[in-house]
Swiss-Prot record:
It catalyses: a beta-D-galactoside + CMP-N-acetyl-beta-neuraminate = an N-acetyl-alpha-neuraminyl-(2->6)-beta-D-galactosyl derivative + CMP + H(+). GO terms for molecular function: beta-galactoside alpha-2,6-sialyltransferase activity. Keywords: Disulfide bond, Glycoprotein, Glycosyltransferase, Golgi apparatus, Membrane, Signal-anchor, Transferase, Transmembrane, Transmembrane helix. Residues 70-183 are annotated as: Disordered. It comes from Danio rerio. Residues 1-10 are cytoplasmic. Residues 145-166 have a biased composition (Acidic residues). It comes from the Eukaryota. The gene is st6gal2. Disulfide bonds join 246-512, 289-441, 459-470. Belongs to the glycosyltransferase 29 family. GO terms for cellular component: Golgi apparatus; Golgi cisterna membrane. It is found in: Golgi apparatus, Golgi stack membrane. This is Beta-galactoside alpha-2,6-sialyltransferase 2.
Length: 514
């Protein structure tokens, strides 16, 4: 009896062991089949892998692969060393915005540059190229009113800060995201965008060639007419280079607030503004001058030494030089700033070294009627109080506010040379700066106001923000400004394409009939 019971126990234990082994075998088989299944692996890793590739992949390798080029590996170096050394040597200096490093934006080799220029206008060597291209494609895929109803609502933030030619943003423009698109966006996007850049090179472009988003934004500004513009002048769209230069020369006299007009005379501004007019601070005159825009296409240009070789260099707003010397140089003679820089505490206008040891020229949009009382009581951004405070603290530094009449006269010239109605908003800082330097210099070289082969939707070389409005305009009549500047260009087409460089004669070298 006892032996029989022992046998049953052994049998039960054996069965349990067999079932356990069978269970483990099945579990092992199931797990191996899951690992070997490519669909399961793709489902688990596709999204993360794609994201990591876009962030970590070598951008030159990715672009070369896309274009079918051979690639070579090279160690990347950071451009932050110079900035760190500067901070160590001068701890009290203001921290500069973190530069987009050489690692993030490697300089393209000639082979890549040649292939890229043949392919289109992508930003070769930029880690964010894919982002920019996708945003552009989304924009240009909006070609049907019916499709627009299926998209997210676009938000345009009022005005852009500073469209100086790759530099605009008085409030950011949020692009709408298309929920549709062709299977191959290149078929639509690349030819159209490339034709726009070529149109700028030729000086022949119209609003109808822009993306639907930018067209809608421009029409909104036309309808809004915030500044009460009522242009009654003649339009001469086909004027020659000489005719345009002579027309601008007649209006070129730089005018700044001198404190003699009300309400400024009543406030004692004659004792606040500089005694020496802006037009006379560089007597007997400057030979060659550089206007350096803040456009993202300044990256990889290697134009720093050429820019610094000029007698004077004009820059805009918060554009830094530390960390970007190879591309933009480090000399600054004049800095044009819009009223936001003075009014917004985040720019640290009274303390930042960006605004020291240079000539400052500020401006703010005023009513087209030139009502100075209305402007003083209701400026776009209050620049008057910060200006007075700065002048009292640093009375020896040349600091001027452009007169609204000077700004709107420039706008009148732009409108007079276009049959289309342009945006009824002041010209961009870029256009103002170019005309200012044409009044002060014998020859003016402008960099990346009209885009080169490096054209990208990266708005500023020192910020990671993308929008086609920075190049083509929304708030400012930037598109029409650029066509007018190109009409006056006496430089070569090769320099325009390779360097984004426009050469303009100073007004003292322009000879006009009486």
């Amino acid at each position: 009896m006892k032996s029989s019971l022992k046998q049953w126990r052994r049998l039960a234990l054996g069965l349990i062991l067999v079932w356990a082994l069978l269970f483990l075998a099945l579990l092992s088989y199931f797990m191996e089949s899951r690992v070997d299944d490519p669909h399961a692996a793709a489902a688990l890793s596709y999204t993360d892998t794609r994201r990591l590739t876009s962030l970590q992949g070598n951008p030159r390798t990715i672009m070369a692969t896309h274009l079918g080029l051979a690639t070579s590996s090279a160690p990347s170096t950071s451009s932050n060393t110079q900035q760190e050394q500067s901070q160590e040597e001068n701890p009290s200096a203001d921290p500069q915005p973190s530069p987009l490093s050489q690692e993030a934006y490697p300089y393209p080799d000639p082979q890549s540059l040649a292939a890229w220029s043949a392919f289109g206008t992508q930003d070769v060597g930029s880690r964010s190229t894919g982002v920019s291209r996708n945003r552009e494609r989304q924009e240009y895929n909006q070609d049907s009113p019916q499709e627009d109803e299926d998209e997210e609502e676009e938000v345009i933030g009022g005005e852009e800060e500073d469209e100086e030619g790759g530099d605009e943003g008085r409030g950011r423009t949020t692009k709408r995201v298309a929920r549709h698109g062709s299977s191959d966006p290149h078929e639509y996007y690349v030819p159209r965008y490339k034709s726009i850049v070529h149109g700028l090179w030729k000086g022949s472009l119209s609003m109808g060639m822009l993306s639907p988003r930018l067209q809608r934004a421009m029409k909104d500004y036309l309808n809004n007419n915030k500044h009460g513009v009522a242009y009654r002048g003649h339009r001469k769209a086909k004027q020659s280079r000489q005719q345009v230069l002579c027309e601008l020369k007649k209006r070129e006299k730089i005018r700044t607030l001198d404190g003699a007009e009300m309400p400024f005379s009543k406030l004692g501004w004659q004792k606040i503004v500089p005694a020496l007019p802006l037009s006379q601070i560089h007597r007997p005159g400057l030979k060659t001058c550089a206007v350096v825009t803040s456009a993202g296409a300044m990256l990889h240009s290697g134009l720093g030494k050429e820019i610094d070789s000029h007698d004077a260099v004009l820059r805009f707003n918060t554009a830094p030089t530390v960390g970007y010397e190879r591309d933009v140089g480090n000399k600054t003679t004049i800095r044009i700033i819009n009223s936001q820089i003075l009014a917004n505490p985040m720019h640290r206008f009274n303390r930042s070294s960006l605004y020291k040891n240079v000539t400052l020229v500020a401006w703010d949009p005023a009513p087209y009627t030139l009502n100075l009382h209305q402007w003083y009581s209701n400026p776009d951004y209050n620049l008057f109080t910060p200006y007075m405070e700065y002048r009292m603290r640093f009375p020896s530094q040349p600091f001027y506010i452009l007169h609204p009449k000077y700004i709107w006269q420039l706008w009148d010239v732009i409108q007079a040379n276009n049959l289309e109605n342009i945006q009824p908003n002041p010209p961009s800082s870029g256009f103002i700066g170019i005309l200012l330097m044409m009044s002060l210099c014998e020859e003016v070289h402008v960099y990346e106001y009209i885009p080169s082969l490096r054209q990208t939707d990266l708005c500023h070389y020192h910020e990671r923000y993308y929008d086609a409005a920075c190049t083509l305009g929304a708030y400012h009549p930037l598109l029409y400004e650029k066509m007018l500047i190109q009409r006056m260009n006496i430089g070569s087409e090769d320099e325009l394409k390779r360097k984004g460089k426009v050469t303009l004669p100073g007004f003292n070298k322009v000879h006009c009939e009486p």
